[in-house]
Regions:
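Active-site metal-coordination/substrate-binding segment of hydrolases
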Residues: 37-123, 135
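Acidic/histidine-rich catalytic neighborhood of metal-dependent amide-processing enzymes
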Residues: 98-181, 188
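Cys/His-rich microdomains that often coordinate metals
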Residues: 280-283, 302
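His/Asp/Glu-rich mid-to-C-terminal helical/loop segments that flank catalytic regions of hydrolases
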Residues: 216-274, 280
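Zn-dependent metallopeptidase/amidohydrolase metal-coordination segment
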Residues: 187-232
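A non-catalytic alpha/beta surface segment that caps or lines the substrate-entry region
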Residues: 1-42
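Short, cysteine/histidine-rich loop/knuckle motifs that typically chelate Zn2+
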Residues: 277-278, 296-297
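Short linker/helix segments within small regulatory modules
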Residues: 285-294
Length: 309
């Protein structure tokens, strides 16, 4: 499936495809198992978006024409079903006034592309989950349903992070693992939750969430930079091949002094954060330039006055 298809397909239709094409499936999770099963990387992404009919009843109404600004800049548009996509072919951006959902359909595209283009002996496991946006039910199901298969994995890599170069560690992974991931061109950043927060600790493996090119997630201003998406896919391809060759099981060793939340609590200073006064969402101060000082949850403007003291 190409990225346009994944950004426009209804979740129920995607589920029907995954039930037929995956090796094993549950109610909210779908696992692709490689032919060679030992010492493999597992890729993770989630199929649900905040724009699913079941999770967002006030979905924006479909629009059928470009704005005057879009027309004047010669942007391309395509309509699939009830969804309008606007493409900036020069910049490689995709946007939708109906809600884009690149969080995390861009990740789904990335992991499926890697699955289909990396031959053995390097073919990864791929785990696709549902309901990440509402608490991670698919991830909880996966750790029970695929316990035997996922125990073979050396690490977990999720493609579900905004931006271009971020690598996020949720479980206080040790510095050696973080340095290894960064050697492929990523830069450590802070995040709060993704499916690997649930999955990796169950198997005592290190895990990372990588940027996949979307911005302003969970808002009507979300867009996808497809060039950055493809760069992450290329970097991840190199990472998978190298990690499979090394066949090292990256066992999780909690390091409370690293970014994130370890057994002894957070090591972040309050002054590293900004909290939205409207909805309470918490942000890392260094991300403000990228976010244009706008809350991605409620779109309120953020201010240095909201920095913890």
């Amino acid at each position: 499936m190409n990225i346009t298809h994944l950004l426009t397909i209804q979740k129920d239709d995607l589920i029907d495809i995954l039930k037929l094409s995956s090796t094993k499936s549950g109610s909210h999770s779908y696992l692709f198992v490689p032919e060679v099963k030992e010492n493999k990387v597992c890729l993770v992404a989630h199929i649900d978006t905040v724009w699913d009919e079941s999770t967002l009843p006030n979905k924006p109404k479909a629009q059928s024409t470009l704005s005057k600004k879009a027309q004047s800049t010669s942007l391309k548009q395509s309509t699939v079903g009830n969804k309008l996509l606007i493409h900036d072919t020069k910049k490689g951006f995709i946007y939708s006034p109906n809600g884009l959902g690149a969080d995390d359909r861009a990740g789904v595209y990335g992991v499926l592309k890697l699955l289909s283009t990396i031959p053995e002996p390097n073919t990864p496991y791929v785990l696709l989950t549902d309901l990440e946006e509402s608490g991670g039910a698919g991830a909880y199901e996966a750790v029970d349903l695929y316990k035997e298969e996922l125990a073979n994995c050396t690490m977990f890599i999720e493609l579900d992070r905004r931006g271009a170069n971020d690598c996020v560690f949720y479980n206080s992974e040790h510095g050696e693992f973080a340095s290894y991931i960064e050697s492929f061109g990523f830069v450590e950043a802070m995040g709060s939750f993704s499916d690997i927060s649930i999955i990796a600790p169950e198997f005592e493996r290190c895990a990372v969430n990588l940027s996949i090119g979307y911005y302003n997630e969970h808002t009507s201003k979300e867009y996808l930079n497809t060039n950055e998406m493809e760069v992450t896919i290329a970097r991840t391809r190199k990472l998978i091949k190298d990690a499979t060759k090394k066949a090292k099981h990256w066992e999780h060793i909690s390091t409370p002094t690293r970014w994130g939340y370890g057994a002894e609590g957070s090591v972040w200073s309050d002054k590293d954060f900004i909290d939205c006064t409207e909805c309470g969402e918490l942000y890392f101060l260094d991300d403000m330039e990228l976010l244009q000082w706008t809350c991605t949850k409620c779109e309120a403007k953020l201010s240095l006055l909201n920095v913890g003291i």
